[in-house]
């Protein structure tokens, strides 16, 4: 997915056979603040660019009263993403599904896109599997190397 204004735009999807039904598909746009891909991309941007994208409360989209609703809440969430090294979303886009995402960066360290994994997770307090995180981080690192022209 890539950032397109305040939304993420899905440009490539690879689905597991028998996997959960996803609302994301090539060409679909979703609010960046509700998705792991969007949060990963926003966390990799300079703070002033994030402020320009989300200048006030009217810039935020919530789903069923959930999701960030202010610049303060968004900055806090993006700081958590940076500290953790990946973005996570539990049930904001689709109930019962969780996602993690990591940005792909260009030679200037600017985020170009994000790679993510989504899985069915009905737990009250979903746990993110370290092996899944590692796989997504390795995929993003490899794509970053390729974008930067390194083998």
Predicted regions and their residues:
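Sensor-regulatory modules in signal-transduction proteins
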Residues: 104-107
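A conserved hydrophobic position in a structured secondary element of the catalytic/binding core
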Residues: 3, 45, 119
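Short, solvent-exposed recognition segments
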Residues: 12-93
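Juxtadomain coupling helices with adjacent low-complexity linkers
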Residues: 72, 77-79, 84, 95, ...
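Short hydrophobic alpha-helical segments used for membrane anchoring or interfacial signaling
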Residues: 1-5, 11-14
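Short hydrophobic beta-strand micro-motif common in sensory/regulatory domains
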Residues: 98-102
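Glycine-rich beta-alpha junction loops
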Residues: 6, 15, 58, 95, ...
């Amino acid at each position: 997915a890539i950032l397109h204004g305040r939304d993420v735009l899905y440009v490539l999807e690879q689905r597991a056979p028998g996997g959960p039904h996803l609302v994301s598909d090539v060409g679909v746009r979703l609010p960046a603040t509700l998705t792991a891909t969007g949060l990963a991309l926003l966390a990799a941007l300079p703070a002033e660019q994030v402020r320009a994208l989300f200048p006030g409360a009217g810039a935020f989209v919530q789903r069923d009263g959930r999701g960030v609703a202010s610049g303060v809440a968004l900055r806090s969430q993006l700081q958590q993403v940076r500290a953790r090294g990946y973005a996570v979303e539990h049930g904001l886009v689709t109930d019962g599904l969780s996602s993690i995402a990591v940005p792909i960066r260009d030679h200037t360290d600017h985020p170009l896109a994000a790679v993510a994994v989504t899985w069915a997770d009905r737990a009250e307090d979903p746990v993110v599997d370290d092996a899944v995180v590692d796989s997504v981080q390795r995929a993003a690192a490899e794509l970053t190397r390729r974008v930067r022209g390194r083998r």
